[in-house]
């Protein structure tokens, strides 16, 4: 990890994304056993990898396309960061295929961690470009111009369908805020955000955006209507093949 003064002296978003210690918040609340075999998918040599290695974990880094070619390997934890390219299939079907492959690579009590954007996240309504297409409103419109090589986000319902169909019986959903890329808070179904808490919404480090409406006020309304999970900008899933409780994984 680069010192903060060096990060802010650079103009590259890629450097900021890879080395900002804010990103450690995504997995920092979880407990990993030393010597755990961890497969990191779509994550280069970043601060997240460094954090896990400092805990004594054995980390292997691959792309999603390489991950589905792995054979005769077993991992204690698999971490997928970001969305998947969906090709000719429906997006949720492609996700199911990848998740099924990940399940094959996990040890019997292994855990899959998936950090992804919500295609119906409030930030996309409010004027942020789609993270994968670089266009405004494309995820909200169902990706009408997407190519087979581009990546697609799903909704909460379809992510959980894909995970369930892949054979994961225990699926816990967390809500990184503002999103999984630079999370300042991690919420859960047992601890959802309260009115007024979601007030750090101008976080478009990678691209320009519009400000179509006051996101804090919109989030307040969504929270009051008890529909925040459907409009969270990102999701963080912790999944196991059986019904084992996830509480032991969480430090705080």
Q: Could you describe each region identified by the protein language model?
A:
Residues 76-93:
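A short SAM/SAH-binding and catalytic strip from SAM-dependent methyltransferases
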Residues 92-111:
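A short glycine-rich, Lys/Arg-flanked "PGG" loop and its adjoining helix->strand segment in the class I
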Residues 45-57:
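Conserved SAM-binding loop of SAM-dependent methyltransferases across substrates and taxa
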Residues 68-78:
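A short acidic, Gly/Pro-enriched loop at the edge of an enzyme's catalytic core
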Residues 16-37:
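Conserved alpha-helix/loop element of class I SAM-dependent methyltransferases that forms part
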Residues 177, 183-252:
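C-terminal lobe and adjacent flexible extensions of AdoMet/dcAdoMet transferase-like proteins
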Residues 113-137:
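Conserved class I S-adenosyl-L-methionine
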Residues 148-175:
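Short alpha-helix
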